[in-house]
Curated annotation (Swiss-Prot):
Top-level taxon of the source organism: Eukaryota
Residue numbers annotated as active site: H118 (proton acceptor)
Protein name from the UniProt record: Sulfotransferase 6B1
Binding positions for 3'-phosphoadenylyl sulfate per the UniProt entry: 65-70, 140, 148, 203, 237-242, 259-261
Organism whose genome encodes this protein: Mus musculus (Mouse)
């Protein structure tokens, strides 16, 4: 993952900015999507268009709170198993976050580079597709995603909080949260589910069988690992192991990034009306699509 000190420094700086930021001041809008002003700038987005990807870059794409830090750890461990070199990115790994000069600095980083993003497919720099970088896309069911996002806002000190779960749910459904609508993100990425160099991973599948998931990721990236190596990485990458080490790897925010990781945690907060509204939105946006089928909505989201 990113160099520990760089990651922690960046997060600490973002949290410091958040202290004086209210919910009404939290967002900047770029090309119709809201982003957190504590992490993103218009200048960085404009500079991103000229980012030069490499063919051996690995891009990890996800909507917020769908497991991006988990996948980043897994891919870092896979690279270590192959190269015997600990992966350490000198920048905060989220591609669209940071200052506008970061992309010049990234030209000096050794390969392979691991990049993460919460952007829609069509908001990414064209060089990613031109140079055929590999893209891992991780999805999580929308109900657990919403609940995890709510707890992140309301549990982390200094981040603007919502008055209630009901208030957050209304904003989530409308797409008025950081990085916008879950469903717009899903619709956009669904168009590319069968693209070359793109692989979709389900958070719930990793929870059910981490060894199989890691093996699939390894094969997609073209790595040849033994079963023993896969087992070792799996042991180091369980949610409990990640949570136990979270303060060391991610600083004070670590325990909030790895809060529970449960499948079905949404049942503690969703009321019947909210269930119906989310079910209708899923049906309207994703029912019958390849991604909709992959999400196994009936298994994970119907009470």
């Amino acid at each position: 993952m990113a160099d520990k000190s760089k990651f922690i420094d960046y997060i600490d700086d973002a949290l410091e900015k958040s202290k004086e930021t209210t919910l009404s001041q939290l967002f900047l809008t770029y090309q119709g999507i809201p982003y957190p002003v504590t992490m993103c700038t218009q200048e960085t987005f404009r500079a991103l268009d000229a980012f030069e990807a490499r063919s051996d870059d690995v891009l990890l794409a996800s909507y917020p709170k769908c497991g991006s830090n988990w996948i980043l750890h897994i891919v870092s461990e896979l690279i270590f198993a192959v190269s015997k070199k600990k992966y350490a990115c000198p920048e905060f790994p989220v591609l669209e976050c940071g200052d506008a000069e970061k992309y010049q600095r990234m030209k000096l980083f050794p390969s392979p580079r691991i990049l993460t993003t919460h952007l829609h497919y069509d908001k990414l720099p064209q060089s990613i597709f031109k140079n055929k970088a590999k893209i891992l896309v991780i999805f999580r069911n929308p109900k657990d995603t919403a609940v995890s996002f709510f707890h992140f806002h309301n549990d982390v000190p200094d981040i603007p909080s919502y008055a209630s779960w009901d208030e957050f749910f209304r904003q989530f459904i409308k797409g008025q949260v950081s990085w916008g609508s879950y469903f717009d993100f899903a619709i956009n990425w669904n168009k590319h589910i069968d693209d070359e160099n793109v692989k979709f991973i389900l958070y719930e599948d990793l929870k059910e069988n981490l060894v199989v998931g890691i093996k699939q990721i390894s094969e997609f990236l073209g790595f040849s690992l033994t079963d023993e190596q896969i087992e070792t990485i799996s042991t180091q990458s369980t949610f409990l192991a990640m949570r136990a080490n979270s303060q060391e790897t991610h600083g004070a925010i670590g325990p909030f990034l790895f809060r529970k990781g449960e499948v079905g945690d949404w049942k503690r907060l969703f009321n019947e009306t909210q269930n119906q509204e989310m079910d209708e939105r899923f049906k309207e946006c994703l029912a019958g699509t390849s991604l909709g089928d992959k999400l196994k909505y009936e298994a994970y989201c119907l009470a």
